Amino acid sequence: MAFDAAMSTHEDLLATIRYVRDRTGDPNAWQTGLTPTEVTAVVTSTTRSEQLDAILRKIRQRHSNLYYPAPPDREQGDAARAIADAEAALAHQNSATAQLDLQVVSAILNAHLKTVEGGESLHELQQEIEAAVRIRSDLDTPAGARDFQRFLIGKLKDIREVVATASLDAASKSALMAAWTSLYDASKGDRGDADDRGPASVGSGGAPARGAGQQPELPTRAEPDCLLDSLLLEDPGLLADDLQVPGGTSAAIPSASSTPSLPNLGGATMPGGGATPALVPGVSAPGGLPLSGLLRGVGDEPELTDFDERGQEVRDPADYEHANEPDERRADDREGADEDAGLGKSESPPQAPTTVTLPNGETVTAASPQLAAAIKAAASGTPIADAFQQQGIAIPLPGTAVANPVDSARISAGDVGVFTATPLPLALAKLFWTARFNTSQPCEGQTF
């Protein structure tokens, strides 16, 4: 009888371990709260039934929520009330904006986890949405719905993080992906409306209007990191016909091996010692990084036509004649040449910078409409050489010798870098790495 009791206790213990493992998805969840000695006793066949009984009770007590489901807590009640409030307010409008707001709110607040993994990010997002719905009293107006949608657009990154890291059930994951896709589409339209209104705009918080020389104030947008793209690449089930990621993030992107080098590329040193592909002249880094010389006038850059058919920069023979003269004299000669060049170019004013929106949602600023058109075509899949040639911009051949090497401490946008791997413009390279490899491979080689 004692032997039968021991076997029965051991079988109950094994059944409890399997139950906890299946319900939590963690094969080691049953060990939570047990000492190393107790864990060893479970897998030892000579352990007495009294000790197994104590361990069994301890496991069941530790995971009591799996055996006795708790009643709906206050947070679930708050989520239900928030959804009801949003439905009541947004139902007064028969507009796409209101419907999208309700879709996003419902998808977030109705999301459920299979396990506790990633639950913190979901709960934090749900609490922020609940609080936003509670404090807003203008959701029943078109202006309030649009302003609330800007708030939701600012949560694109958080929604993406929840989808990528939280252990959601299938229905919640599909609903959140659909909401993210629709919200991403809406964010592109909202960006276009802001561009049409011009640079002088006042934010919803009553901030003063920006100056005429600054970019228009736009809604906060998710940063183009690779979490969501890697999620979509690893889980093809999320890319159903109705859940395609907008903006062409999966569009054809030119291969790095077939991409020619570009003129006036600046080099930047990576922490690992390599060099990264640098910016096209006049293209601003995403996020408004304060890089020097990014928005220099077109007249300040070397003419793209000042290269011979081999890609070598054409120089005035007088430059070689005065190569050994003192620095002051050469500086005076350059100033006189700049004044003469300025007189010759005064008839055509410099072209204004042009804003370009990349397929991943980032915005860069090109120094001229021609350069903007070339960047847009290259980002859409056109080979970079063809994209620049269509705009009349000549590109030096790969391997072109460096005529004027400069010290690495003086590198700025517009300088030429030499790499052992083919360089790309920073914005295009970032998109290429994000969509294809989810990692960046630094180029190695000498930087000038």
Curated annotation (Swiss-Prot):
Q: Which residue ranges have biased composition labelled Low complexity?
A: 243-261
Q: Name one Pfam family in it.
A: DUF4226
Residues covered by region (Disordered): 187-221, 243-270, 291-361
**Which cysteine pairs make disulfide bonds?**
none
TM regions (residue ranges): none
Basic and acidic residues bias spans: 187-198, 307-334
Q: Which family does it belong to?
A: To M.tuberculosis Rv0025 and Rv0739.
Descriptive protein name = Uncharacterized protein MT0029
Q: Write down the species.
A: Mycobacterium tuberculosis (strain CDC 1551 / Oshkosh)
